[in-house]
Amino acid sequence: MNYTVLVTGSAYGTQNASTAFLFCQSLIKMSHILNSVFFYCDGVLNANNFNKPSVDEFDLLSAWKQLNEKNKVKLYVCVSAASRRGVIEDEKISNTKIKNGNFASFFQSSGLLELAYSIKISDRIIQF
């Protein structure tokens, strides 16, 4: 089966994102196709490169990166939701006083059109 995962919970403070990550890993282990993971609402905070947990906590940002690199899973972030929550790409900060963005490079900024396309080609969409 083809899946799209929609993450609407932040990296820390709720279990939405960590549960979504574990679900994605299970899909891959069970030989399902994971088309993409789309981060929306507070889920865009998963793409904040400044997320640094303490040494005894699970590093969800690194886990998403490994999922992307090892399994070629596309990680889409809603650019509008991200900018409203202060997650900004380097290329988008030219008209601000900020020197560097905090958008992790292995995520891709996109709009809701990408989510709609992912839903269209998937058998299932699962929201966390």
Curated annotation (Swiss-Prot):
Report the top EC class in one word.
transferase
**Residues at the active site:** C78 (cysteine persulfide intermediate)
Q: Name one GO molecular function term.
A: sulfur carrier activity
Give GO BP annotations, semicolon-separated. Answer: tRNA wobble position uridine thiolation
Where would you find this protein in the cell? Answer: Cytoplasm
**What Gene Ontology cellular component terms go with this record?**
sulfurtransferase complex
Source domain of life: Bacteria
Give the EC number(s) under which this enzyme is classified.
2.8.1.-
Per its UniProt record, what Pfam families does this chain match?
DsrE (PF02635)
For this protein, the record's InterPro entries field holds: DsrEFH-like, Sulphur_relay_DsrE/F-like, Sulphur_relay_TusD/DsrE
The keyword tRNA processing is assigned to this record: yes
Q: What is its main location?
A: cytoplasm
Instruction: Keywords in alphabetical order, please.
Output: Cytoplasm, Transferase, tRNA processing
Role this protein plays: Part of a sulfur-relay system required for 2-thiolation of 5-methylaminomethyl-2-thiouridine (mnm(5)s(2)U) at tRNA wobble positions. Accepts sulfur from TusA and transfers it in turn to TusE.
Q: Family assignment?
A: Belongs to the DsrE/TusD family.
Q: Which HAMAP family match?
A: Thiourid_synth_D
- Can you state the subunit structure given in the record? Heterohexamer, formed by a dimer of trimers. The hexameric TusBCD complex contains 2 copies each of TusB, TusC and TusD. The TusBCD complex interacts with TusE.
This protein is called what?
A: Sulfurtransferase TusD
Species of the source: Buchnera aphidicola subsp. Schizaphis graminum (strain Sg)
* Record lineage: Bacteria, Pseudomonadati, Pseudomonadota, Gammaproteobacteria, Enterobacterales
Name of the coding gene = tusD
